[in-house]
Amino acid sequence: DLIVSRGLGDVYKRQHLMSPMMEFSELQMPFICLLVSGGHSMIVDVKEKGEYEILGQSQDDAVGEAFDKVAKMLDLPYPGGTYIEKLAVSGDPKAYDFSRPMINSNNLDMSFSGLKTSVLYTVQKIDDLNDNIKSDIAASFQSAVVDVLVEKIKKAVKLTNRSSVIIAGGVAANNFLRKEIKNLEDKNGISVYYPSMKYCTDNAAMIAFVGSKMSHEKYDIKSNARARWPLNEL
């Protein structure tokens, strides 16, 4: 889908799509953005100011949502992403072979509901869910998610021939994801950017940055309040 943004309602997504540009002056459009958060999981071709093409997105749970639900299965606090990552450090990412839905699909869409269910079935079969087992489950789950995201980014780069990739959204704070996607630089001849940790989650600095950019453009700011606003309806 080709989207030309027209209103103030897109500030939330634009702040994440453009967040690395606050810190990396050399980053220029066009580029590929992997936007992963609690409410959104999509790969976007950022063509120019206000013009984006959604190349693929989750067909069910967002990545951050899946992290939170798996964290709940493991009796971890909310929000679960940080706690899953901490547990995974001491776990074996190959301990459990969780499903990786749509990893080999011809398109760039993703699915994390099946992966979440795979974890649930595993947890239900375990009588003693001790810390070591929790760490292995967390590491295996995190590895499965990142495998899917890395594979989709590789396909997006090949499809668009873009030389720059940015990772944005709350899940972009995950160090394992950062490391694995950063590894694509040498293997695929691309440059990978991600914002500082403080800019991964919603913050006023990013909104102000995007607002300053939008102030030089013509926007119709009439919009209705909605909890979630699909990018292709902005």
Predicted regions span which residues?
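Short glycine-aspartate micro-motif
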Residues: 31-35, 166
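Single conserved hydrophobic/aromatic residue that forms the stacking wall/gate
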Residues: 1-12
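Conserved phosphate-binding/catalytic loops in two-lobed NTP-binding clefts
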Residues: 165, 182-207
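Conserved phosphate-binding catalytic cores of ATP/NTP-utilizing and phosphoryl-transfer enzymes
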Residues: 10-32, 210-211
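Glycine-rich phosphate-binding/hydrolytic loop that grips phosphoryl groups
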Residues: 16-20, 195-233
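Glycine-rich phosphate-binding loop plus the immediately following alpha-helix
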Residues: 25, 48-92, 116-117, 121-127
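A contiguous, well-structured pocket-lining segment that forms one wall/lid of small-molecule binding clefts
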Residues: 86-165, 174-188, 215, 232-234
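Short beta-strand scaffold segments in enzyme catalytic cores
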Residues: 18, 33, 41-45
